[in-house]
């Protein structure tokens, strides 16, 4: 549409295109990688420990990439919970990100991942983790559940996962939102 309006070829204007038509190399990882870099800097600045437990609400593209990149880029960390549109799972001893991605691709869901137990969707957001990645739904963290968020860092990979009212509560509770 932009090219139609301007009447010129401009491949750099929009993302998520194949490389052959001007897409960006690294696009697949871009959202998650940017989030992880921001988490790394927040941890360095405020003394948080990225090698502790983390959870991902929304195990789609961004959530999967964050799970895979977290350990690689932050020197460790234990994924203890993940959710998708069909349900949520947890294992306090950790979920292997690579195996979970494979399982999701094979079955279409995180549910029934070996060694995990099913938990309510909303519980993923309220677990006692160092870092929480809301990577699925707008308004997932809202006035009703913000007081229950125990993460020290919330790294928003979804579009608008935290409502303005919830953001005020998180700020008051010293939860850092990226």
What is the predicted function of each stretch?
Residues 1-25, 38:
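N-terminal ligand-binding/catalytic initiation module
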Residues 26-126:
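Glycine-rich phosphate/diphosphate-binding loop of Rossmann-like nucleotide-binding domains
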Residues 55, 131-133, 155:
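Structural motif
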Residues 80, 130, 152:
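Conserved acidic residues
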Residues 124-128, 147-149:
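Flexible, charged surface loops at secondary-structure boundaries
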Residues 136-178:
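Rossmann-fold NAD(P)-binding glycine/threonine-rich loop
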